[in-house]
Amino acid sequence: MQREYDYIIIGAGSAGNVLAARLTEDPGVTVLLLEAGGPDYRLDFRTQMPAALAFPLQGRRYNWAYETEPEPYMDNRRMECGRGKGLGGSSLINGMCYIRGNALDFDHWAKRPGLEDWSYRDVLPYFRKAETRDIGANDYHGGDGPVSVATPKNDNNVLFHAMVEAGVQAGYPRTDDLNGYQQEGFGPMDRTVTPRGRRASTARGYLDMAKPRDGLHIVTHATTDRILFAGKRAIGVHYLVGNSSEGIDAHARREVLVCAGAIASPQLLQRSGVGAPDLLRALDVQLVHDLPGVGQNLQDHLEVYIQYACTKPVSLYPALQWWNQPAIGAEWLFAGTGTGASNQFEAGGFIRTREEFDWPNIQYHFLPVAINYNGSNAVKEHGFQAHVGSMRTPSRGRVHAKSRDPRQHPSILFNYQSTDQDWQEFRDAIRITREIIAQPALDPYRGREISPSADCKTDAELDAFVRSRAETAYHPSCSCAMGTDDMAVVDGQGRVHGMEGLRVIDASIMPRIITGNLNATTIMIAEKIADRMRGRPPLPRSTADYYIAGDAPVRG
């Protein structure tokens, strides 16, 4: 087997697959793509059927199933931290919501020294490059990219339309495209689903077009033990296949690209000798490079479910009954349509809860059934819910390797809800959600409040609900942040500070979490850096306009 390549990519996820596909477009370039999980089995409905999105989170075949340390502000709960395992990474198990973030997220990134070319108008062309939207291209959307994006259709569930209308009746804007000119407001939510109703993971979109190339070698069930160095230069990796304890060395002529995600990327750097000296000494790992920011600055989105009974039989509750599922599965399998062909997150929104925020600080996902994201605690009646959570928490956490063993999970602490702002935002969000649900558009459907219940009113009661019931939105990020400050890990091209031949390219390099779901932005990051690595000029800056609230009131 070949043991030397131009590039070695660690992690076949949302970023790694983009890089594998783009780098091998150049003739003669060789890439080794290592993935600790298995293939993305195309006949496994658990990962391929959009409506089955909860199933991969319930086991360990496709999910690393990380768990946090006891979270001190969350009743000391050990909280779930699911990450994708298999070709596609977290794009193989995520909720398929295609949300890019707010334009001002990127403009604020670009205000940091060294990140000036990460403004919204710089990154929008790369969002477009990656995308094929089912209703065609425009100034904001692409028409010939590897990622299939489906838009909601007018004949979808009536509850989606009612919930958007209720948000507008409550005084918030309406937007026809959460990824277009104006993110702020309520409207339809795009999703990464193919025209045939299949999950559009990066394995399907990018690897499928790259697999026939002679320059790409993919190894699944390959756990990277450590990065190999010659001085300060990364020269390869040592990895294990399957359950074997005997490792394999592979060498990189050009670069090693770490794309293992916001949990595993810092853990791998630490095990390889790149990180804070005190931590490495505790692990008995020889220091290669002192870089204290590795594993710091960890961020996530937290959310709660506000659930209501539905007084008309229009929710998806019947789809949860086993006797209805064979017909749903058959329609999806043979026609690519029906309930199974949607993730059922087809409406949502972004709002500002207070005038002090320059762009939305709260996100909504609307779901026409009452159930936890991971499929647990389904309410046994017709219902609907709003997933609501804050977007740019001031809380910061960390990821620490626990040992040199590559198969041992790291220590993860998000420090959820560690600031007064966190608590105020959730109180505001729950109360505003109740106002929205109380609007006339939902009068025909609104039953009793199931969770947290109408009796939960005071600040103390709302705080107790959040402490005991809030869950991750599965958006860990920022743990190898790009920038130039003392705690930055990489520069604006993903190159690890103080090292040669080593980059980190995934959600961990975001300097600050974005306003929305992470998958689309992670793909964009990889597309943008791939052009730099290939010596290509950046795509021309967009001239598209975008909404800035300015002095506009929170509610119209």
From Swiss-Prot:
Cell inner membrane found in the keyword field: no
Entry EC number(s): 1.1.99.1, 1.2.1.8
Catalytic activity entry: choline + A = betaine aldehyde + AH2; betaine aldehyde + NAD(+) + H2O = glycine betaine + NADH + 2 H(+)
GO cellular component annotations of the record: membrane
Binding residues annotated for FAD, in chain numbering: 6-35
Keywords, alphabetical: FAD, Flavoprotein, NAD, Oxidoreductase
Pfam families: GMC_oxred_C, GMC_oxred_N
Protein name: Oxygen-dependent choline dehydrogenase
Source species of the chain: Xanthomonas euvesicatoria pv. vesicatoria (strain 85-10)
Gene that this sequence comes from: betA
